[in-house]
């Protein structure tokens, strides 16, 4: 998983 956006930890 990768943290991207605003505190959004999702498979980017």
Swiss-Prot record:
DNA-binding in keyword set: no
Keywords: Amidation, Disulfide bond, Hydroxylation, Neurotoxin, Oxidation, Pyrrolidone carboxylic acid, Secreted, Toxin
Coiled-coil annotated residue ranges, if any: none
Disulphide bonds in the chain: 3-12, 4-9
Tissue: Expressed by the venom duct.
Residue list for modification Cysteine amide: 12
Positions of modified residues (Methionine sulfoxide): 8
Post-translational modification: Contains 2 disulfide bonds.
UniProt KW Transmembrane helix keyword: no
GO cellular component: extracellular region
Record PTM Pyrrolidone carboxylic acid, positions in chain: 1
Localization in the cell: Secreted
Transmembrane segments: none
4-hydroxyproline: residues carrying this PTM: 11
GO molecular function, one term: toxin activity
Written domain comment of the UniProt record: The cysteine framework is X (CC-CX[hydroxyPro]C).
Chain's role: Chi-conotoxins inhibit the neuronal noradrenaline transporter (NET/SLC6A2).
Family affiliation: Belongs to the conotoxin T superfamily.
Protein name (record): Chi-conotoxin-like 2
Gene source species: Conus textile
Source organism phylogeny: Eukaryota, Metazoa, Spiralia, Lophotrochozoa, Mollusca
């Amino acid at each position: 998983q990768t943290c991207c956006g605003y505190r959004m930890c999702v498979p980017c």
